[in-house]
Amino acid sequence: MGKNVVVLGTQWGDEGKGKIVDLLTEQAKYVVRYQGGHNAGHTLVIDGDKTVLHLIPSGILRDNVKCIIGNGVVLAPDALMTEINMLKERGVPVEERLLISEACPLILPFHCALDVAREKARGNNAIGTTGRGIGPAYEDKVSRRGLRVGDLFDAELFATKLKEVMAYHNFMLTEYYKCEAVDYEETLKDALAIADYLKSMCTDVSELLDQARKAGEPILFEGAQGTLLDIDHGTYPFVTSSNTTAGGVATGSGFGPRHLDYVLGIMKAYTTRVGAGPFPTELKNEIGDYLGTKGHEFGATTGRKRRPGWLDVVAMKRAVQINSVSGFCLTKLDVLDGLEEVKICVGYQYPDGTVATTTPLAAEGYEKVTPVLETMPGWSETTFGATSVEQLPQAALNYIKRLEELLETPIDIISTGPDRNETMILVNPFS
């Protein structure tokens, strides 16, 4: 029987999921996105050729793989078409490989307008959203006024529903945020223009995945963002609007949770965060600059500079707990090359002197803590491009071993560069 594997980020996103998903899809029949939207940025480098995907699953470059956008994903039709056209220009037969759930909530222009208006109104308290309408679209879903992909297939009903929801949101835009209203007729025309095209790719995702499971076909579920950005378990309110954790697989695709066999947590050898929010191990010094520059730490979606810091084992333990992580993939180990010493956060010290080894439940708690750091010797040798454990310096191996001890979870894959070939698979999640 084929295995069903989840690949997700265990930090604040940008861990290197796209490369690992692409690598593992060699053994998968289906690759499924189950949450988020085009706020995610997954970078693939194959033989030096770089591809950045935001909405379409990373397996789209494989000719033996069907890619699925599940119901938990909020879908922006214009962003999807931009991505499809980019891939088609490169010779990728997207229509043959991509399937979409009719239950995906739609992101429409008024969602983006609201997102931008709210961030502007927050001023210095801005959350740091991508401004792409993700949050407002999820709000409409939960409020049961949202429009879904399937609504596009009845033009008359769609027009009625759209008019109702736009009256509500345009009132907020003009009267509360003092912004321009979004044009109803233009929004309607643009949405209906691609209805038939989207319909040709729609399917019953839950049924398809269940039949695939019964047939023994391996399925890979691709997470976006990271555990610490989860709407329920992240550094609230500095979080995304979806469930980025393993639990989101079932709700965002309709796949039964008992059928998940392996959860691969992607963990960078250090930590980064983009946008606002607490970050106990953040390095605002020359070492932070070194990590940011060497690691090319700029967001794939927004281009924003990421904030670097030491690896936070306290937060990673929470990620292991929430996701039932089976094993880790350690990425960007090579970025630590050349440092005299490397540090790991093993506890949080509060102002009264007490030390905790578990994370707070909200952003305010994180703001109070100081990281308790364990120092280990660094290494001068390069790990870049290493393809076997024997090629790694002893100090790097000691660092990996210490992480496994602290997390009580094996590191099954090690990534030492951006190309899919620069990877060591010690234990294959599909084996």
From Swiss-Prot:
Binding-site residues, GTP: 13-19, 41-43, 306, 332-334, 415-417
Reactions listed under catalytic activity: IMP + L-aspartate + GTP = N(6)-(1,2-dicarboxyethyl)-AMP + GDP + phosphate + 2 H(+)
Presence of keyword GTP-binding: yes
GO annotations of cellular component type: cytoplasm
EC number: 6.3.4.4
Domain of life: Bacteria
Any GO MF annotation of the entry: magnesium ion binding
Binding site for Mg(2+): D14, G41
Cofactor stoichiometry and binding remark: Binds 1 Mg(2+) ion per subunit.
Keywords for this protein: Cytoplasm, GTP-binding, Ligase, Magnesium, Metal-binding, Nucleotide-binding, Purine biosynthesis
Residues that hold IMP according to the record: D14, E15, G16, K17, N39, A40, G41, H42, T130, R144, Q225, T240, R304
Any single biological process term in GO: 'de novo' AMP biosynthetic process
Cofactor(s) required, per the database record: Mg(2+)
Main subcellular location of this protein, as a coarse class: cytoplasm
Metabolic or biological pathway: Purine metabolism; AMP biosynthesis via de novo pathway; AMP from IMP: step 1/2
EC main group: ligase
Transmembrane segments: none
Location of the protein in the cell: Cytoplasm
Gene3D superfamilies associated with the record: Adenylosuccinate Synthetase, subunit A, domain 1 (3.40.440.10), Adenylosuccinate Synthetase, subunit A, domain 2 (1.10.300.10), Adenylosuccinate Synthetase, subunit A, domain 3 (3.90.170.10)
UniProt-listed CDD domains: AdSS (cd03108)
Entry annotation: catalytic residues: D14 (proton acceptor), H42 (proton donor)
Family membership: Belongs to the adenylosuccinate synthetase family.
Assembly notes: Homodimer.
Main function: Plays an important role in the de novo pathway of purine nucleotide biosynthesis. Catalyzes the first committed step in the biosynthesis of AMP from IMP.
UniProt protein name: Adenylosuccinate synthetase
Organism: Shewanella halifaxensis (strain HAW-EB4)
Lineage, opening ranks: Bacteria, Pseudomonadati, Pseudomonadota, Gammaproteobacteria, Alteromonadales
